[in-house]
Design a protein with these regions (language model features):
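A cross-family "folded-core" feature that marks the main globular domain of proteins
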Residues: 1-192
Length: 192
């Protein structure tokens, strides 16, 4: 099935539905045709039908460059940090990055109230967020604030630990509250 000029849905040799990405891969293709191997840039083998459906829907409306950036960030995380990530990261991170790029182009920057805690409790994931912010700047010339690296880090926490994004936010929030109580009791001011 052709999703757009750059994305097609197909079945691999085992009968598993896959989503295939490549520049112009869907252009002038007909249903049932074999996908030209030389045009394949990435194959998404998603075991969950619901995630596969969300991914196809997301990829259909997103610029290929943004999908490629997201995929590169995920590949970097798996390779350099040796992270085992839930497949939902392809949907959640790609969607987040696309929305963040749109916001930043309009000059809208969201403050990440948990940035300090994210840096302290999830340093590896925060470094991935920094890598993502730098990659977006390099490829698309879109400046993203450091706060965005923190938001991106939470997507990796979620995918790494198999939790809901709300759970990934809950821990640093609780730590922030605990540190506030300790600071109040000791009569000290805590900073970075």
């Amino acid at each position: 099935k052709i999703i757009n000029n750059n994305i097609v849905s197909a079945f691999d040799e085992t009968g598993l539905e896959v989503v295939i990405m490549g520049r112009g891969i869907g252009f002038q293709m007909k249903r049932g045709q074999k996908v030209p191997v030389e045009k394949v840039e990435k194959i998404f083998r998603i075991k969950s039908q619901s995630i596969a459906g969300q991914l196809k829907e997301l990829l259909a409306k997103m610029p290929l460059e943004q999908v490629q950036i997201s995929n590169e960030i995920i590949s970097y995380a798996k390779k350099t940090m040796k992270l085992k990530l839930n497949q939902s990261i392809y949907v959640t991170l790609t969607d987040h990055i696309s929305f963040a790029i749109s916001r930043c182009k309009k000059g809208i920057h969201l403050e990440n109230a948990l940035l300090w805690e994210i840096k302290r409790f999830y340093p590896q994931e925060f470094e991935l967020g920094r890598y993502a912010v730098e990659l977006v700047k390099k490829r698309l010339d879109v400046e993203m604030p450091e706060d965005e690296a923190g938001f991106i880090a939470l997507h990796f926490v979620n995918a790494e630990y198999g939790t809901d994004i709300r759970d990934a936010v809950r821990f640093p929030n609780q730590m922030k509250e605990i540190l506030g109580i300790v600071a109040d009791e000791l009569g000290i001011e805590m900073d970075e």
